[in-house]
Amino acid sequence: AAEPRLVLRSGDDSTEEYPYHIAFAAWAEAIDKASNGEIKLEVYSNAVLGYERELIEGVQMGTIDFCTTSLGPFGSFAPQINVLSLPYIFKDVDHLIRILDSGLSYKMNAYIEEQNVGFLSLGWICGGGRCFYTKKPVYSVKDLANLKIRVMENDVYINMVNLLGAKAVPMAYGEVYSALQTGVL
């Protein structure tokens, strides 16, 4: 087979079973088929190209063409995006989707472009809400006192957890397992 004329790279820090990766893999197949093999999208999962912040920086530098990322790391590059991360601003996932579909996603995309941060958003997805997972039950805010809780590397999440009385531990998602093993969390 002939070499592709264009090779693009996509990265995420999730497993190959995660919906983001599955979607990018399907997109890669569609691109290959539609271009008759002239365009190839290489899809890297499991943080092979880095965790979310490194993926975003890779897109900025041009070493990565596409990535999926959470709002936490993303908001560090375009701060007004953080409004979507504010605690309890959405009632549920349907509420978030209605807001994004109302035109907010286009306004956010325009804002990102205006910031000239070196990347654009191709779309918005809901990756789920934020929950606390602990070894002991949490019935009230008092139960969070001094618990070490992993948060994304973003001031909105760090401040929220600290204001609830817990101790925010900012780190990439892929570092959680070893942090649990070593007692960091």
Residue ranges and their predicted role:
Residues L41-N46, T69-S70:
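Surface-exposed patches in mature extracellular/periplasmic domains of secreted proteins
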Residues A1-V7:
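Short, low-complexity disordered leader/linker segments with a strong preference
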Residues V7-A25, N46-G50:
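Extracytoplasmic "Venus flytrap"
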